[in-house]
Structure formats: C-alpha cells, structure tokens
Amino acid sequence: MNEAVSPGALSTLFTDARTHNGWRETPVSDETLREIYALMKWGPTSANCSPTRIVFIRTAEGKERLRPALSSGNLQKTLTAPVTAIVAWDSEFYERLPQLFPHGDARSWFTSSPQLAEETAFRNSSMQAAYLIVACRALGLDTGPMSGFDRQYVDDAFFAGSTLKSNLLINIGYGDSSKLFARLPRLSFEEACGLL
C-alpha cells in the first residue's frame, strides 16, 4: 500500500511551488534533464500511449530559433531561462503501441479513427506535461509553463517533415524568487468540485 508523502514534499510539489518568470544564472545539466524524463515517463497515459516528445532548448542558437514564435509577454522570461522544453505530441504515437501496450491490438483503435488518435495524443501529452512539471519540482527545479506562442511557427521551425506537433512550452531552471508576482488565488473545493 502507498503511504502519503511528507508535508514538506507536498509543499515542494504543490502548495509552495510557483510559476517562475525570472531565473538565476544556474545551468541545468543534461543529466538533470535525463532525470526529469526518467521520472515523468512513469505517469499514466491512456493505453500507455506515451505520445509526448520533448525538445529541450539549452543553447542561445536554439532560443533564437524559437524567438519569433514567442508572444511579447513570454519573450524575456524564455530567452533568459536555462532551458525551454517544447512539449510536443506525436500524431502517429500508435506506431509504438505494439511495444508499449502488447496486450492486444491497441494500434488499430487509433488507425481506424484519426479523430480519436488526435484527441488521445493531445490530451495525454497535456497530462505528461504536468508530470514533467512535478518531476522538475521534485528535483529542486522551478518551471514556467506557457501556451502563448505560435504553434504553427514552432511546428515549422522544429518539426517540419515529422509527425510531431507542439502543445506547450515550459521554461525550466532555478527561479529568482525576487521576480515572483503575488500569489494568485485558486478556486475552492466548493467552487470547482461536486459530490454525487
């Protein structure tokens, strides 16, 4: 049986964690990026489909390539972040299902319905992006997820000729707490949830 994590872990992962807009000049190693993926990949996806593909942009050249796609409000925070992850989804994720879900012919569920395949890929890559954020926090990193960018530009600049499509961007690094905004409220249980 699972045991609840410590209050300190809950604070790190959720209640005290913040979305960061400014960054300390501390690099994030490639080994740390591998550790992030090694954790996030275990989060559940539908039929273990694992549609997410990630490009970790760590270089000035990569950031300049990304720059034209960024909204003005996301420009500076992205250019100064040690890493920006392009979280994408593979529109042909089902080609890996014989490896990832060998219990039956799951591939045919999606090859027979392009709409189901697209919905599944997008929904599950969004879940995997959340796992990435939690994995970063668990390893002592901060994040700044963003949907304010030109997806078509990113797809053309980074994924042309492939089956990948961008979902969102996540800045990763060690946040500068002096640049945080005041904490915004969240909906209460009564406002967001129902009991039947």
Curated annotation (Swiss-Prot):
Cofactor(s) it depends on: FMN
CDD domains: RutE-like (cd02148)
Pfam families: Nitroreductase
Disulfide partners: none
Record's keyword terms, sorted: Flavoprotein, FMN, NAD, NADP, Oxidoreductase
Catalytic activity, reaction form: 3-hydroxypropanoate + NADP(+) = 3-oxopropanoate + NADPH + H(+)
Entry EC no(s): 1.1.1.298
Lineage top rank: taxon: Bacteria
GO molecular function: 3-hydroxypropionate dehydrogenase (NADP+) activity
Sequence similarity: Belongs to the nitroreductase family. HadB/RutE subfamily.
Biological role stated in the UniProt entry: May reduce toxic product malonic semialdehyde to 3-hydroxypropionic acid, which is excreted.
NCBIfam families cross-referenced by the UniProt entry: PRK05365.1
Entry protein name: Probable malonic semialdehyde reductase RutE
